[in-house]
Amino acid sequence: MGLILSAVTFGGVMKWIGFIAIALLCLMFMIVVHEFGHFVVGRLLGFKVDEFAVGFGPAIFKYTSKKSGVIFSLRCLPLGGFCGFHGENDEEDKPLTKDNFNFHKPWKRILVFIAGAGFNLLSAVVLCTIFFMAYGDMMPKVLMTYQFENGIEQNLQEGDLIIAVDGKSLYSTAVPNDLANRIQKHSDKMNVTIIRDGDKQDIVIYIGDYLSTNAENQVIESRGLGISITYEEYRFGFIESLGRSFVFIFKLFGTIFTSIGAVITGALGVGEAMGGTVTAIQQIAMVSQIGFRGVLFAVCALSANIAIMNLLPIPALDGAHVVFTTIEWVRGKPLNRKVENIIHTIGLICLFALAIILDVVHFVS
């Protein structure tokens, strides 16, 4: 009995270690993509890069490009990476050379700063498109039809898959209850696109009063399409999937900004709206149990999240660097580099502290 229990416990622990390892790799992927964005745009604009590293800590492998002099390294801690621009953190007392990061024009530096978030956003679009092509979106499928009280015959049949209303696609993943929201905008009928026996059809369906049964098997009067539904995966081609990825990310941005606004106004606690690195790893590890589908969806959402959060004007984040560089551009001269570096250092410490506090709060709750 004890041996069996120990084996089960050991197996469960090893499984969770695997999920956490997957989560760490996903997190590292998103951070490396971010840093790669800085690297690519920086090199295209003529910036000198000292090192591009995958991971942190002591280097396991190093390669120096003979053409550019960039050191590419693989480090032992799989917790992200970095792109080290030459002289990026130099202060004013050091003379600027043409290879120095701050020697370049402000608009070039701004492009480099936003490139990381841009690559995160691009990766979110690509991965989201792959997700909708591979797994599709959840479309409402007719399970049962009910008779309208006025005797009108509904044009829907059992097994019909509803994919669009009034020529506009349904977005179940991006917009929960999308079909119900569309129904509320019509009074008695609406045009829908359905898949019936593998064929796409445009039909008119009706809205009316009908009798149905609830969970307690009681007869109740309702108003709607006179159907009960479930949801089924429906895959899309490249163009439709690409469009859906933009809709999903746009809606996600709306949710993020709404949450930020709620935190600012006090309607939502910081701990309810945000989480630290450990929380992100925990979330990815949990969806890993679903399989590759869950991991892919989580990385899509988190990549878009990282893109937005990194552009917020918070010291140590790219958004704050953009603000400081824009001020320099307008003034025609930089702010005190030493003061700016101190501000970013304090911001970084505060962000680390906040991440730890949020992770502790999530763990306790």
Spans of features found by a protein language model:
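Hydrophobic alpha-helical segments of integral membrane proteins
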Residues: 52, 73-82, 86, 110, ...
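Lipid-exposed faces of alpha-helical membrane segments in multi-pass integral membrane proteins
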Residues: 21, 25, 115, 119, ...
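Juxtamembrane boundary at the C-terminal end of a transmembrane helix
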Residues: 357-365
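PDZ peptide-recognition modules
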Residues: 2-13, 93-107, 115, 119-269, ...
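Membrane interface segments of multi-pass transport proteins and intramembrane proteases
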Residues: 61-65, 143-148, 326-342
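Residue-level signature of transmembrane alpha-helical entry/exit and packing/kink sites
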Residues: 15, 19-23, 104-113, 120, ...
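Small-residue-enriched transmembrane helix starts and helix-helix packing motifs
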Residues: 293-307
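Small-residue-rich helix-interface/hinge motifs
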Residues: 3-6, 18-95, 302, 309-331
